[in-house]
Amino acid sequence: PTEAELIAFFHECVKKVSIETCKTYVNYLRKPLDVNNKQSVLAWKKYYKWKGDIEAWKAIKTKKSGVDLRVPSEAEVREWLAKVKGTKVELLFRLLLESGVRLTEAVKVLSEYDPQSDACDPNTNICIYTLNWSRGSKRAFYVFHVSRLERQSVTYNYAKKLLHGLDIEPKYIRKFVATKMLELGIPAEVVDFLQGRTPSQILTKHYLDLLTLAKKYYPLYAE
């Protein structure tokens, strides 16, 4: 697309979605189409639709949603850390990376942060925040972390928008954490417990066993 086309597309785009999203589209339109990148595919489809080029729009195949096997590399995660430094989502990103919990849970921790619920070990600097939040099959009992937390006025949509603006997809942080923990030899059941994937019929004793195991294994990842 020419610069004039990109400007016209952008002005039309902001009528429907946020400025950040439209900026992201324009950035992708400055590069060749990458069929393996969902954002790139989306940007080019939006552009061709806006242009009225239905043939080109149809030609871009959206990948069938199968299992997403992408796991970011350590180098990629380090890049993300550099990107968030000094931004309003830096602490949130660190919490996601340290704990492996979902974005909704990390947002809840920071937006309702209560120091009374945060137990920190002065010897290891590892903290365990009691969240005890269930919805459906999702249960986050504890959030393990290292960074010092503080209450922040952050909402899920605002956080997601800022992270997307930096080209960071929260679900991949979660996948990175799970993969790294398993690589370090942390049992899958403990990884599930740390990430809030605990079955509803769990017995109290087994739950306490998992908490004990989580305390034992988490330092392997925290280091």
Regions found by a protein language model. Give the residues of each.
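Catalytic-site neighborhood detector that most strongly recognizes the C-terminal catalytic loop/helix
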Residues: Q195-E223
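Short alpha-helical segment immediately N-terminal to, or the first helix within
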Residues: L95-L96, K180-M181, L194
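Flexible interdomain linker/hinge and immediately adjacent N-terminus
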Residues: K49-E79, N132-K138
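Active-site/catalytic core of tyrosine-dependent DNA strand-transfer enzymes
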Residues: Y28, S137-V177, L182-E189
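Conserved tyrosine-mediated DNA breakage-rejoining catalytic core shared by Y-recombinases
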Residues: S99, V109-L149
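Basic, Lys/Arg- and aromatic-enriched nucleic-acid-binding interface segment
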Residues: P72-L103, P170-R174
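Alpha-helix N-cap/helix-start motif at helix boundaries, enriched for small hydrophobics
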Residues: L92-F93, T104-V109, V191
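Non-catalytic DNA-binding core/recognition domains of DNA-processing enzymes
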Residues: P1-A56, G100, K171
